[in-house]
Amino acid sequence: AESEAAESVADTQTTEGGTITVAASATPHAEILEEAKKILADQGWDLEITIFDDYVLPNEVVESGEFDANYFQHIPYLENFNAEKGTHLVNAGGIHYEPFGIYPGTKKDLSELADGDTIAVPNDTTNEARALLLLQDNGIITLKDGAGLEATVNDIAENPHNVKIEELAAEQV
């Protein structure tokens, strides 16, 4: 996502370089940007990367013009953020595909899931739905008919393992 100020920078066809400020999550986004920083430096650009540990501030600092861009979110999250917060952020382009998975924690695999175990899911609208759909695809829960990309824990129709779904900030999951 980027602000109008960053859009004007992106539209400028200069080779003089300058500074680009980016708000990013630590992994993998800041790591990827560190590699891009080397390439940009060869072209006369200074990439300043600031790591944020939440999913709200990076959008707020771009919207305010304090940063040129951010790098941490997928398009559904960006669109939902704009709708909820009245912001005007835009997608500047895709960089990488971020897979979503189920990680068994202390278990070797999902077959060791026991009745009453706790499963953490992101608490933001788009990522929570993705997590719940993934749990459904793996037979852990069943969602109500029609629960799609806006599903919440309230849409769980069946929970045969009586797992506890704990909603946490995405960066904590």
Locations of the language-model features?
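Beta->alpha turn/N-cap motifs
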Residues: T27, D54-Y55, G65-E79, H96, ...
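Alpha-to-beta junction loops
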Residues: E63-Q73, D117, I140, H161-K164
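Ligand-binding "clamshell"
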Residues: N80-A92, K107
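Short, well-ordered beta-strand elements
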Residues: T15-T27, W45-I51, T118-I119
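A conserved helix-loop-strand patch within extracytoplasmic ligand-binding domains
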Residues: A92-T142
